[in-house]
Amino acid sequence: MASPGSTALPHKRQRVRKACVPCRERKRKCNGKSPCEMCVAYGYVCHYIDGRVPSASPQVQQVGETSPDTESRPFVLPGIHRNEQPQPINTQNVTSQNIVDPTKSRYTIQHSAVAFPRCLGLELRSTNPPRLHSFAWHCGIRPEENPNSHVLLSDLVTKEEYYRISKVYFSVVHPIFDVVNPEQLAKNVEKYWDGDVKTLEYGAVIAGVIALGSFFMGSLGHPREMDIVQYAKGILDDPTFSRIPTVEQVSAWVLRTIYLRATSRPHVAWLASCVTIHLSEAIGLHHEIDREDIAISNNVPPKRTTVVSEHTRRLFWCAWSINTILSYDYGRSSVTLNRITCKPVKETDGNFTAHLVALAHLIPQDSVNANAAQLLQALAAVHESPNAHPFLSLTKGDICLSLYRRLRLLNHILDKNVVLQIIDIGNTALSAAYALVKLDQAWWNVLSTSFQYVCVLLAIDTPESLSHVATAMKTLDNITQILGTRIAFEAQKTAKLLLEDSMKKKRQEIQQLEQATHQRSNLETTHLLDIDWDALLDPSDTLNFM
């Protein structure tokens, strides 16, 4: 029945004048476009009886084509190649489209062995095409791993303790690494402590929040923090959950990566960050799920609201930023995805995730073959980026020092202005490190950035850099005394050793210069001793020379 307000425009059934051949054969609704939505979704070759073939339609955006959204981005996303002219959609483009199965959070591409049987069934016009499944992936001789047994998180920490510790997490970690939806977390916490089995996987996220919150409480942290960390690890390693990756797993892996970066060896943290990116790709977080170049398996519409989409973007870009920055600092390869269509995160008050992502994008994409000009350009961009948060100032320091180390390997002679940029970034990072450590916020780079800055000042070895060594060493000493850990004292001892070696080297250089001065003095003395002063000063003796 038409509403009263619709009398002026009576509702009429809209019909398409001509349907494409694939839709006519399958008796499916066609919107008459070229290509139509149905062919785009199922990967059919859209064509019409009148001979029309798919052409570049404004309704279909190919990966690589610019859009108003991409034009307004503050940075260029890596892996996206923009073309100025839209290209016609051909069969090759269609068959290279991606497939997302929302029922299992599974992402793949049509030339994958997992997707090919279904694509073939659709091409053969099967009434019941094969599902998106890894048919014949192995011989099936052995069963899959059995699930692991887990203690209850509620046996390790009470709900009251969770709420107390989570306040620290949301005040310290969440503003920078926005990987947890607070509203969704609050709902799942209540369900988890009520014994809902379905939220067991989400227990890894809850445990990750507790672990990081406890870590940043310092000496007031939870006494069973390590048990909570192991609980989260056990959930993530459980084959029951790892068989089907989810957004919750990615969130939990990001939290675990942050914790490992703050507490464990670099290789372990780097490995966890790589796993996080691979899981993100497995569920298609690096793509916009509503893009028309992504076919939806089983014609199930994606269940992503605007809020959910923004959360998944923040989650993906946080994971990508951690892997990119950590890999660049550690000197390992970051995970490179074939292409990324995920939109950038929006800036919000009190949230610095967008700033972190922007910093990560300043790192040269080809970190191995970047030349001096590219490194200097990146360094200048890092210097110009805002110091919106003390942790971001430290991150700027990490990237800056990483860029310098690569410039040093290229034997590039730094201009005085470049040295001043490094010193400015380093001094700001020093102040941020000392401020954070006094707040008991022991981010990993309060120590590492301070230590590396001392090393870089000694390596630059110019009057401008050496004039800041004393202040940097004093700050490192103060941070070491506050932390009071073995690793802090080890870094302090190493920095002092390098300083002493630098002084020793300069003393040797001075001695070498002094030797040249002594040789000159000895030479002059030798020449003076060869003169017969008595004969020279005796007037009578001068007659012999006349």
Curated annotation (Swiss-Prot):
SMART domains: Fungal_trans, GAL4. It comes from the Eukaryota. Residues 20-46 bind DNA. Gene3D superfamilies: Zn(2)-C6 fungal-type DNA-binding domain (4.10.240.10). Transcriptional repressor of multidrug resistance genes, such as PDR5. Required for growth on non-fermentable carbon sources like lactate or glycerol. One of its GO terms (molecular function) is sequence-specific DNA binding. It is found in: Nucleus. It comes from Saccharomyces cerevisiae (strain ATCC 204508 / S288c). Keywords: DNA-binding, Metal-binding, Nucleus, Transcription, Transcription regulation, Zinc. Its main location: nucleus. One of its GO terms (biological process) is response to xenobiotic stimulus. This is Protein RDR1. GO terms for cellular component: nucleus. InterPro entries: Metabolite_Synth_Reg (IPR052478), Transcription_factor_dom_fun (IPR007219), Zn2-C6_fun-type_DNA-bd_sf (IPR036864), Zn2Cys6_DnaBD (IPR001138).
